[in-house]
Amino acid sequence: MAKSLVIVESPAKARTIGRYLGKDYTVEPSLGHIKDLPRKHLGVNVEKGFEPAYFVISGKAKVVSKLRRAAQRAEAIYLAADPDREGEAICAHLKEILTDKTLFAEAGPTDGRPRKKRKPAKKKASAQASQKNGKVVALDMPPPVSMKTKFLRVTMNEITKRAVREAFEKPGQIDHNLVNAQQARRILDRLVGYEVSPLLWDKVKRGLSAGRVQTVALRVVVEREREVRAFIAEEYWTIHANLSAAEPPAFDAKLMEFQGKKLEIANQQEADKHTAALQAAVYRAESVQQKERRRYPVPPFITSTLQQEAARKLRFGVKRTMMLAQRLYEGVELGEEGSVGLITYMRTDSTRVGQEALGEVRDLIALRYGREYLPDQPRFFKSKKGAQDAHEAVRPTAPSRAPEQVRAFLSEDEFKLYQLVWQRFVASQMAEAVFDQTTVDIQAGERRLRAVGSVPKFDGFLAVYEEGKDEQQRAEEEEEAEAARLPVVREGETLTLNALKPEQHFTQPPPRFTEATLVKELEQKGIGRPSTYASILSTILEREYVRKDKGKLSPTPLGEIVSDLLIKSFADIFDVQYTARMEEELDEVEEGKLDWRAALEEFYEKFALDLERANEEMESVKAGLPTQETCDRCGKPMLLRMGRHGLFLACSGYPDCTNTREPEFEVHGIDSDDTTPESEVQLCDNCGREMVIKRGRFGTFYACSGYPDCKTTKPLTARGRGAEPVPLNENCPECGGQLVEKHGRYGMFIACSNFPECRYTRQKTLGIKCPECQQGELVERRTRRGRRLFYGCSRYPECRFTVGYKPLAEPCPQCQAPLTFEKHLQDGTVRFCRKDGCGFQVTVAAPEKLVEAAPS
């Protein structure tokens, strides 16, 4: 019989760790958090020092019962949740549920209330619950563990045999500073969500939510959108001269100075003047400088840079990246080798690398690429201020395990992410790349031109990996990227003018955020931490405060209104700098430098004042917000109001005047170049008047501006939604061309960019093997009319497996079926098993309206 019980969060992690521990250990999963604040009540006693009231999460009674039974037989209990605040809180709650005599839970569909249309279940004392006061239930559980039972905390940065052995040889105790930091964050978020969300329900519409950090992230997106709208493009010109020296080839030089000063050409008139002067000038090479330029590798990944690079290179959303990274960390089945953790812990802000890993990767570089690719000493990278250096960077657990060695055992997406992590880590310890750079300054009368050429001399780390660039970075580096090989040019040599190329340009607005650049912005501003970036982005997208179109984020009209209302009423709480300072205070709580209650008291003092004022002064969209528009029927001011299908303008003279119309704000997520060109006005087929873009119940459409006299409408077709494919970092297996992602009638698919010459296509998969044929992968599809989403095998019609629920690559913890599924019910989102006779089901998310909800 096993003498020790080990508790981890997931079945995958349990399988991997169990392989290394042997028969003296039983490893059980908790399936994530086991206790939390109540869903339907505040759960925080502000008057008693912000005392939280934690309950066993609805649907977790069976898990708790199983853990308590297993704990009865154990002499020692090892708590092995992830090495961060959330993991430490899980460990603290696990210890409580194993030692407390009485456990309480909120009454839910699985705790205390029978499900409808089902026969009464036979009584199971281990997991039954008795009703108490209609709201809280006391769970009937196996007895708590003996007071003599030892509780030990083990943490590991990677799940490998060596790391597991070292962790269990030197166990520690629960770090209550980490627990307090997590608890403080949870209470802060609960106070804001619980107190502010009902304001939005009252002033805007039910079902909306506010969050301490999500609102600040929304503010950042809104402010960027307004910068884009307010931007006024300015004209400017550049002039390039194509020149020849005594030896070929010809080359381009850019006009840089006039009369010894930097030249900026504002319009065509100035450009023509300089072009005429250059046409008549004599060109002489005044100076020729040659130097060696070195480019150094970037550090290995931290959480934020992993999310950014996966978005740039793989087009993965932040949530998807973290889900895949979690799988690679917890363990993947590698045939006879069994379950193996392939990467280190993925929630980290440290670039530190352990000595053993440094030795392994240096040996690999020398063996695989040659000694010339290995620097004399290992590279050490400086982590940002406040980074938790107890963690390492995100890296492969075994650098010698090359991506091609494990490809057969990974889904397509898992392989891509592992390859990215492996390449980045290996490149970070390689020699720098070397370029020969030549700069030629050319005098042409009163004007000076410059030509820059760069030639690779040694590829160094670029043989393995080159960091992707954001839109703005690419624009800034265009000229450097275009730098080509120059001919031999001698100082004093007279050059021949072949052609002049004046070009008109316009300054560009700041780019809208992508998921990658928003994470980068939040990190730079100190908003959020590695464990929260994914949830921040998911929340503002799921709440429809922000829309993502072709990878670009823009606020919805609802998002802008919510942001404006909250920032006006809670100017200090939702201030970017204040939010960043709160993150620093939570870090201080984690370090034991600040009492968690003191941090909460400082926050709540401001928050309570703002809340009281907001209840009285916040404007109501339901009542109508004033606008500059006037009613075209009676001349009274129009009000902006919220209806069932979104925002609309209504006459303030209601009920005497019932005039309404669509607001004239920009329809976000549809850029001007996505739809009809500005020069091509859409006219009504019925009356000939101009058509305008409107938003209705089923999306955006064209409507006649003559409404209500003419009620003609027609679909809005966006060229970008089918005709502009998105390039992928992958080549066509048939012709070698670049693969692109396209939007078809039944959803997204992947095709060759050389169409129609090459007709290679494949469906975009979820990265999950078909449970029926074990050969194809599951793909997202829509019914013929596009009304219903379902999932099917990529080998259709050979394999006809389909399912109406979203499949998850998470095994069932009860029957070990390879997949579980997700569905949305009135009581919330649940994860369940479809296998006959299993019955596993657990709530994974509260109903949308109850997330940080006010009392019903």
Where are the regions that the model predicts?
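C-terminal or mid-to-C-terminal helical accessory/interaction module adjacent to the motor/catalytic core
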Residues: 159-241
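Alpha-helical scaffold elements adjacent to nucleotide-binding pockets in ATP/GTP-utilizing enzyme cores
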Residues: 16-20, 66, 89-97, 163-170, ...
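Short acidic, hydrophobic short linear motifs in intrinsically disordered regions
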Residues: 285-288, 297-310, 337-345, 509-521
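Basic, low-complexity terminal or inter-domain segments flanking catalytic cores
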Residues: 2-5, 16, 97, 109-125, ...
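Core structural elements
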Residues: 184-195, 213, 243-245, 293-305, ...
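Metal- or metallocofactor-binding catalytic centers and their adjacent structured scaffolds
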Residues: 264-299, 490-493
